Every structure is written in C-alpha cells, then in structure tokens.
Curated annotation (Swiss-Prot):
Region (Disordered): 15-89
Record-level GO BP terms: division septum assembly; FtsZ-dependent cytokinesis
Gene: sepF
One GO cellular component term noted in the UniProt record for this chain: cytoplasm
Subcellular location: Cytoplasm
Bias kind Basic and acidic residues: ranges: 22-42
Keywords recorded for this protein, A-Z: Cell cycle, Cell division, Cytoplasm, Septation
Similarity comment: family membership: Belongs to the SepF family.
The keyword Transcription is assigned to this record: no
Protein name: Cell division protein SepF
Length: 197
C-alpha cells in the first residue's frame, strides 16, 4: 500500500493546459526567484557559528593571485606587441628558401647498388624514399630476379613521383622527384647493341 501511495501523485494529468502570457511567466519566475532567495537566507541564518568559522578559514587559505594584466595599459601592450613582432621577423624563414636548401643537400648524394638477391631491392627503395638518386647494376644477377627487381623499383619510383632510366646493359638510374636527369644516352646504347649483333 505504501508504494502505491508513493506513486499516486507522481504523475499529474490535466485535461486542459493553461497557456500563460509573457507577463504571467515573468511574474511567476520572479516569485520563484524571491522564494529561492528567502530559502537560501533562512538556511544561511540557521548555520552554526562553527560552520561560519570553517568557511572563513577556507576562504583565507585560498592564495591570492597577482594580476599583472590589469595593471598594464593598452599603450604598454601595444609597445610590447610591436617589439615582439620586430624581433620575430628576423627569425622567419620562407618555405621556398628552406626547401631549396634541403633539396640541394639531399640531391648531392648518389648511391650505387649491385644487388645479388631480390631482398637487396628494399635497401634501394629506402634510398629512393630518402630522396637520393640510385644507380643499379644488374649484371651479376639472373634475368628472372633482375626483372622482378626492375618491376619493384618501377613501382617505387612511380609512387614517389620519380623516374627510372636505362643507362647501360642491365644498368638503371632511379631518381626521385628532386633530381633531374639531363640528356639521354639510350639512343647510343641501342646503336651499340645493334653493332654487337
């Protein structure tokens, strides 16, 4: 029975809802606020002096913050900002200068490889990923493995946006995108191959 009585008035069903105007809403809100303030004041007055002393001690134990911001004027702030911007302008490096110096350092190195097994191809690909040109000599490896290596390097070069060129009999030049190859010797190679046949 007690449980039934507990939930008896829990749900309120009204057949007609009253629509309050804006003035009525404001007056009801203000009445609620006044009621809340009165309840709060009653609770504060009923507090024991001991709890009041504890609150005072807690307030005293909070450290005071020094606010330098409020002491500075807008002129001082503007002066500081101007000085900071002048100092920072000397430290700015444009991206074009940085990338040019980076590419100049990286493009000056070329790696030579003579793979004996297919697993050596990963070292060649790592050098290409590090933006270094590689010259690959496949004369001392069987033709099947050489074809697999060239296929792998072609995919690597394509992925990094570079280029692969044949520069001799079973010798290939693989270059990343930061290296340009000027000239062509493939015509000369083809003429040499026809001459030997």
């Amino acid at each position: 029975m007690a449980l039934k009585d507990l939930f008896n008035n829990f749900f309120v069903v009204e057949e007609e809802e009253e629509v309050e105007g804006p003035e009525e809403r404001e007056s009801s809100r203000s009445r609620e606020r006044v009621q809340e303030r009165e309840d709060y004041n009653r609770n504060e007055n009923q507090a024991t002096p001991q709890t009041f002393n504890n609150k005072q001690q807690a307030i005293k134990s909070v450290p005071q913050k020094n606010t330098l911001r409020s002491n500075t004027t807008s002129e001082e702030r503007n002066y500081r900002m101007n000085n900071n911007s002048k100092n920072n302008s000397r430290n700015v490096v444009t991206m074009n200068q940085a990338s040019q110096s980076y590419t100049a350092q990286e493009s000056s190195k070329m790696c030579l490889f003579e793979p004996r097994v297919f697993s050596d191809t990963q070292d060649i690909a790592d050098e290409l990923k590090n933006r270094r040109a590689t010259l690959v000599n496949l004369q001392r490896i069987d033709q099947v493995s050489a074809k697999r290596i060239i296929d792998f390097l072609s995919g690597t070069v394509y992925a990094i946006g570079g280029d692969i060129q044949r520069v001799g009999t079973d010798i290939f030049l693989c270059t990343p995108d930061n290296v340009e190859v000027a000239g062509s010797i493939t015509d000369h190679i083809e003429n040499m191959e026809q001459h030997y046949e």
